[in-house]
Amino acid sequence: MTDRARLRLHDTAAGVVRDFVPLRPGHVSIYLCGATVQGLPHIGHVRSGVAFDILRRWLLARGYDVAFIRNVTDIEDKILAKAAAAGRPWWEWAATHERAFTAAYDALDVLPPSAEPRATGHITQMIEMIERLIQAGHAYTGGGDVYFDVLSYPEYGQLSGHKIDDVHQGEGVAAGKRDQRDFTLWKGEKPGEPSWPTPWGRGRPGWHLECSAMARSYLGPEFDIHCGGMDLVFPHHENEIAQSRAAGDGFARYWLHNGWVTMGGEKMSKSLGNVLSMPAMLQRVRPAELRYYLGSAHYRSMLEFSETAMQDAVKAYVGLEDFLHRVRTRVGAVCPGDPTPRFAEALDDDLSVPIALAEIHHVRAEGNRALDAGDHDGALRSASAIRAMMGILGCDPLDQRWESRDETSAALAAVDVLVQAELQNREKAREQRNWALADEIRGRLKRAGIEVTDTADGPQWSLLGGDTK
């Protein structure tokens, strides 16, 4: 599919849905704020990955070349605090949870990014950016830290709508700040924390600086689309815009933000104790069913989790799967065809997935009628269109990845029951300070090809070189 009819996307900065026109014809550059790898992923984290994976797949289906960058924040206050509380090196804590996020994305067949830069790998670029800001009069040093001077950038607040007098960065009071509305670009060295040398002394980067530097490194001073969760609009994305444009970069031309997964009307978060971890969810539903559910709402809408909604999504997915299996059994091989015009119109209208799904189920109903009437050609046309459309949404039931994973998921579920029993025995041994027995259980599991990692969320197991549970 190469017809590039008008694609319209909601730009947070403009506050409206507007025509998407890339910087370079035929090419799209996208930066997605990825995970801060402080803990295990839950379905709220992964929804963002699914939402913008659909955007990427749709652009690819329309014939664009897509450069898709998703970063990893592997140095940040919460990572340091949680690693210290667990008595583990910060870098090991970050790497462990980065692997868990990668496994979660892979489980839902989120396409790998074109590049996945880590913040710690781009310290040089961050220092260079600070130097440009200081030279331009937009940043200053104070108390070992470096701050961005918010009042030096008159356009501050254009993305979020915040008025300058109402700005609160949430960083607390700092002696080196000239104005409490300013935000930190570089944090001076503290005992026990990692640090890097700079012209202003040793220290580590501020969160906002990291993304600006990495986006520029991979996509250049100006690129097409910046994505992320709606909770990042302020202060994170507002500060990214300010520092990047103050440094002379055009930065992102479109800003897309996805809604949260909520429970009881509250954003899913560990602090509220209402999270549903990816390993737990994948014990209850198949990966393709979970992906279907997370992608089923409009990306800008809140997705209120409930068991009823989850089961409705499973039922809808199984209905499509059953239809495709019936056609394959009675008619023959089903190859992906082309999406219908109504499906394309829906996705061209700011990725209106609910309307696109309604079209898919309409085509399924037509296909079932054709199959029941003995119209094999009509049934095959419907099935081919459904495969194409579900493929763009990332959950084509006949894709070999999903069919093989169904068998793998069932096997992992059976193994998990056995491993969890062993882990419970190990936890009891540790509570009784029977370290020899605890080590024996861990060694027994390792000899069976199962690695155990102790985290703040409890012990997690993974197949050596494979899936995490």
Swiss-Prot record:
Which SUPFAM superfamilies does this entry report, sorted A to Z? Anticodon-binding domain of a subclass of class I aminoacyl-tRNA synthetases, Nucleotidylyl transferase
Task: Specify whether Repressor is a keyword of the entry.
Answer: no
Its quaternary organisation is: Monomer.
Motif 'HIGH' region covers 35-45
Residues that, per the record, bind ATP: K270
**Keyword terms, alphabetized:** Aminoacyl-tRNA synthetase, ATP-binding, Cytoplasm, Ligase, Metal-binding, Nucleotide-binding, Protein biosynthesis, Zinc
Q: Molecular function terms in GO for this entry?
A: ATP binding; cysteine-tRNA ligase activity; zinc ion binding
The identity of this protein, by name, is: Cysteine--tRNA ligase
Indicate the enzyme's highest-level EC class: ligase
The record's remark on the cofactor is: Binds 1 zinc ion per subunit.
UniProt key word Heme: no
Protein family (similarity comment): Belongs to the class-I aminoacyl-tRNA synthetase family.
Q: Which PANTHER family match?
A: CYSTEINE--TRNA LIGASE, CYSTEINYL-TRNA SYNTHETASE
Cofactors demanded by this protein: Zn(2+)
Q: Could you provide one GO biological process annotation from this protein's UniProt record?
A: cysteinyl-tRNA aminoacylation
